[in-house]
Amino acid sequence: MDPILVLVLTLSCLFLLSLWRQSSERGKLPPGPTPLPIIGNILQIDVKDICQSFTNLSKVYGPVYTLYLGRKPTVVLHGYEAVKEALVDHGEEFAGRGRFPVFDKATNGMGLAFSKGNVWKNTRRFSLMTLRNLGMGKRSIEDRVQEEARCLVEELRKTNGSPCDPTFILGCAPCNVICSIIFQDRFDYKDRDFLNLMEKLNEITKILSSPWLQICNTYPALLDYCPGSHKQFFKNYASIKNFLLEKIKEHEESLDVTIPRDFIDYFLINGGQEDGNQPLQNRLEHLAITVTDLFSAGTETTSTTLRYAILLLLKYPHVTAKVQEEIEHVIGKHRSPCMQDRSRMPYTDAMIHEVQRFIDLIPNSLPHEVTSDIKFRNYFIPKGTTVITSLSSVLHDSTEFPNPEKFDPGHFLDENGKFKKSDYFIPFSTGKRICAGEGLARMELFLFLTSILQNFNLKPLVHPKDIDVTPMLIGLASVPPAFQLCFIPS
């Protein structure tokens, strides 16, 4: 038989088999657009704005639908009811971590953020317990944040009211807080090694939010066989991990098991007990990736939110004026802000909540995975299926937040000007995979922003109406555009 004919017949059979398999799977899964063989539904997704693509598809297929990202089915949950029903009402079944190829390759299933099963359960339980032991939720951690807020204010004073890019200054403060928790140390804001780390973290966020990385996560083979920005991601990730491995080595040499100093000490003393059969090198690798997760998440998410908050306050000076008026009335000029002040500052609290809602920092959270076969809303979702939860669809729900595309602290105020909670406020996600550092992040945002506005007036370099607050990238994170401003001492 003609070899070309054999090849054509073989490819045709593979094509039909692929169609049959996808059709068979789709009969069980929620509805969705018909996928093409091999490439799935990638042509129906705008990799520059995945959130809008998800919203458009939800209007056709409803709040629970199936997409094929490559050849793998992925269930998308859109809207508050679907997200809550899955992550809260069926929390155990949706507590797995879905495929995230770039991180799967970098972490090898270790650490806190991207591990699964018992590895994740043990690591999360240990991490939460240790963070509490180190003062999370207590006065001691507030003291650390207040001290760093004072350092931040002093660093901003050194700009002498001149135009500056706030990216790294605002990143140093939350980074120093998490460094003090992980390895009991902080850095000077001008330390070259420190700024190098900050630069690598900032670059990682941009790379992860780029269209190219969205494509790589859909077609993981590209990570191994194609050039691209993912190579720089792996290089930066390895640099940060190696920096932390050096800190771990220093801790091993100075460890006193009777007096644990920080997160690394607690892990070296207790953290490997449940994995006692694991080789020492694997346990140290797991520790390194765990603290890399804490270091990265504890720095970049808060610093990006702070940066976006400053940009929005420049854009809306009437909001800034109201916050500063409240700061003057409640705190004054002669003491540092503290967390007790928050309950007496409803407008400031509402402003910070509105920043987090409006910027939609991690629009689709991290991917989940169902840990067992489950019947969900009359659909069958098999074990191992990746699930994407659209936090953006919840934070921008027009029934809960009128004019959701408008920045308005009134979304979190009642008719009497009191702070109003909302179940739809889930920037840290919800359920069993909710961000472990939520409490610390909320404390940092309040204390850092109030300290800045207590001591400085924010002066933009252009008229507020000309300030663009549109994200420069929307992928894993919503990345704000670059900007400069002047911090004028008040």
From Swiss-Prot:
Listed SUPFAM superfamilies: Cytochrome P450 (SSF48264)
Signal peptide start and end residues: 1-20
Enzymatic reactions: an organic molecule + reduced [NADPH--hemoprotein reductase] + O2 = an alcohol + oxidized [NADPH--hemoprotein reductase] + H2O + H(+); (5Z,8Z,11Z,14Z)-eicosatetraenoate + reduced [NADPH--hemoprotein reductase] + O2 = 12-hydroxy-(5Z,8Z,10E,14Z)-eicosatetraenoate + oxidized [NADPH--hemoprotein reductase] + H2O + H(+)
Membrane topology category: Peripheral membrane protein
GO MF term set: arachidonate monooxygenase activity; heme binding; iron ion binding; oxidoreductase activity, acting on paired donors, with incorporation or reduction of molecular oxygen, reduced flavin or flavoprotein as one donor, and incorporation of one atom of oxygen
Keyword Heme: yes
Metabolic or biological pathway, per its Swiss-Prot or TrEMBL entry: Lipid metabolism; arachidonate metabolism
Modified-residue entries (Phosphoserine), positions: S127
Subcellular compartments: Endoplasmic reticulum membrane; Microsome membrane
Modified residues (N6-acetyllysine): K249, K375
EC numbers for this chain: 1.14.14.1
Gene Ontology biological process terms in this record: arachidonate metabolic process
Pfam families, per the entry: p450 (PF00067)
Function: A cytochrome P450 monooxygenase that metabolizes (5Z,8Z,11Z,14Z)-eicosatetraenoic acid (arachidonate) to primarily produce 12-hydroxyeicosatetraenoic acid (12-HETE). Mechanistically, uses molecular oxygen inserting one oxygen atom into a substrate, and reducing the second into a water molecule, with two electrons provided by NADPH via cytochrome P450 reductase (CPR; NADPH--hemoprotein reductase).
Family note: Belongs to the cytochrome P450 family.
The name this protein goes by in its record: Cytochrome P450 2C37
